[in-house]
From Swiss-Prot:
UniProt xrefs under Pfam families: Complex1_49kDa
InterPro entries: NADH_Q_OxRdtase_suD, NADH_UbQ_OxRdtase_49kDa_CS, NDH1_su_D/H, NiFe-Hase_large
Lineage summary: Bacteria, Pseudomonadati, Pseudomonadota, Betaproteobacteria, Burkholderiales
Protein name as catalogued: NADH-quinone oxidoreductase subunit D
Location relative to the cell: Cell inner membrane
Role played: NDH-1 shuttles electrons from NADH, via FMN and iron-sulfur (Fe-S) centers, to quinones in the respiratory chain. The immediate electron acceptor for the enzyme in this species is believed to be ubiquinone. Couples the redox reaction to proton translocation (for every two electrons transferred, four hydrogen ions are translocated across the cytoplasmic membrane), and thus conserves the redox energy in a proton gradient.
Amino acid sequence: MAEIKNYTLNFGPQHPAAHGVLRLVLELDGEVIQRADPHIGLLHRATEKLAETKTFIQSVPYMDRLDYVSMMVNEHGYVMAIEKLLGIDVPVRAQYIRVMFDEITRVLNHLMWIGAHALDVGAMAVFLYAFREREDLMDVYEAVSGARMHAAYYRPGGVYRDLPDAMPQYKASKIRNAKALSKMNENRQGSLLDFIDDFFTRFPKCVDEYETLLTDNRIWKQRLVGIGVVSPERALNLGMTGAMLRGSGIEWDLRKKQPYEVYDKLDFDIPVGVNGDCYDRYLVRVEEMRQSTRIVKQCVEWLRKNPGPVMIDNHKVAPPSRVGMKSNMEELIHHFKLFTEGFHVPEGEAYAAVEHPKGEFGIYLISDGANKPYRLKIRAPGYAHLSTLDEMARGHMIADAVTIIGTQDIVFGEVDR
């Protein structure tokens, strides 16, 4: 009698649970995965190569488009690498603004993750709830930079501009009556900081809501507990970082272990898992949202009390003010040179890493003294995590592969770069 062979199945790239353009070639024995082979490159846009043809400042918007749900954190790694090479110190107010927006971005990312992960597993409501909160945070992005997603707000030497004193309000339209309008604009009467403060006062209750729906939910636990278990040793050897590593019980967070900006002045905790399964990683990320809330609250408090510059006053790197430019010839020349030729960065190399919502996001930058990078290497956390999929999915069912892709929080912009 002929023996039954394993059969091969293509998962994606046109698949709702494939998180973009993931293509998996699965080798199955019945419904059990024997091997999972990720095929990447379907969203490759040559970001690293493009950076070699652009001035240092022109590449900032490209960073937004790497992991397109954690926009500002990508920029942060890039501008930190440039600042290391230039040897410049960023004003403290700008550092607090950066840290605040890093944490807002972390919450944005985790809201997207919890919504998509739950939807993949079969829970619909959390997805809608998460997007309700994301909307407010997108408005914060828009208030400060003019764009809801691709902000290009961080610049070498600081941030693009200080926080606005007023929050944009909803306007009257045919579909909104006066009562609805006044309710929508209720928390938008003050400054941007007031709005952020109001949001993060409400937000812990929202996180409790998600936990009510998921944490003790029988079906959720059946789908996540004991799935994709990674031991602490394997997690380290596989190059995992971020929530994936902490879910396996290793307390490693760049914000604590290699503090950058003002993280060493802030009070927060690092959540750590025990079993290293999908459920633990879920709990770690939910707790991270609570810790981000603490950090943002501290930043808001500090920013209210301490006005000051948000950009260095070295006009070789940072553009001069509009007012100065109209009255001073030198400043006009600086402005012209900056936006045509860009600034020249001293010869050398630098590596800057930030604690990205998905793990360690690193930028390795080599300069040959020109106005463009000689080479830019992006260390994307999702790339290392996706390569562990084969090991994590082996011996599980097809349905569990969806859970494992969800727990890895894969975004293809950064995997393919």
